[in-house]
Amino acid sequence: MYRAVTRGIEVSVEPFYLEDQSEPEENRYVWGYRITIANNSTETVQLRSRYWQITDANGYVEEVRGPGVVGEQPTLEPGDSFQYSSGCPLTTTSGVMVGRYQMQGNGGSLFEVDIPAFSLDIPEQRRTLN
């Protein structure tokens, strides 16, 4: 499990390899990841957008931006949490993802919340990022 905390917003990530969706002979490797966003702050926040930087084992970098997550822009009261799952295909056996969410606070102010860097590795090549 990977964790980062920004302004009382904790983001936890649990990546997992999806062997049944991967096709190594076609250089297609697929991972899922489960993210929990916990609002440990004293203000209500809304997740407005996401940004991902995905780097494969060859150093190829892809950037992904978009509104919300999995079609939602959840609002989190203090003490609330939101969990979702998504996935990422690569053409290499490993990679790294890192990113950030743009959140909106009570007064309309926007701020960024870090998504911790996490490694995508097939089980035979497991590594750990701290």
Swiss-Prot record:
Pfam families with a match to the protein in the record: DUF525 (PF04379)
One record GO biological process: error-free translesion synthesis
Coiled-coil region list: none
InterPro entries named among the record's database cross-references: ApaG_domain, ApaG_sf, Uncharacterised_ApaG
ApaG domain residues: 3-127
Gene3D superfamilies: ApaG domain
Protein name as annotated: Protein ApaG
Natural source organism: Brucella anthropi (strain ATCC 49188 / DSM 6882 / CCUG 24695 / JCM 21032 / LMG 3331 / NBRC 15819 / NCTC 12168 / Alc 37) (Ochrobactrum anthropi)
